């Protein structure tokens, strides 16, 4: 998937794009495993050593607030994220 699709998704939901936000959205759009914030951080950190866990958590919160991604709460300790916001079974 090209970064352009992630950028377009951010623009569609009126989220100001940044390098980190585009990378996080791109990861979500490419991985259908409903990753946690830690999984996303661990996947992106080797390519983006300036990325912090706080940035990942804050970015995911913005995505959820704006409706760009879906929050899937398994229990109090396991929040997962899904870029597919159309109704579907989990």
What are these regions (language model features)?
Residues 65-90:
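Non-DNA-binding regulatory cores of transcription-related proteins
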Residues 56-66:
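Basic amphipathic alpha-helical segments that dock to polyanions
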């Amino acid at each position: 998937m090209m970064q352009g699709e992630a950028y377009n998704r951010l623009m569609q939901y009126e989220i100001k794009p940044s390098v980190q936000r585009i990378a996080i959205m791109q990861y979500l759009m490419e991985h259908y495993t409903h990753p946690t914030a830690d999984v996303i951080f661990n996947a992106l950190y080797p390519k983006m050593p300036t990325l912090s866990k706080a940035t990942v958590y804050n970015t995911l919160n913005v995505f959820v607030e704006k409706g760009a991604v879906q929050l899937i709460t398994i229990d109090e300790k396991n929040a997962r994220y899904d870029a597919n916001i159309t109704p579907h079974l989990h």
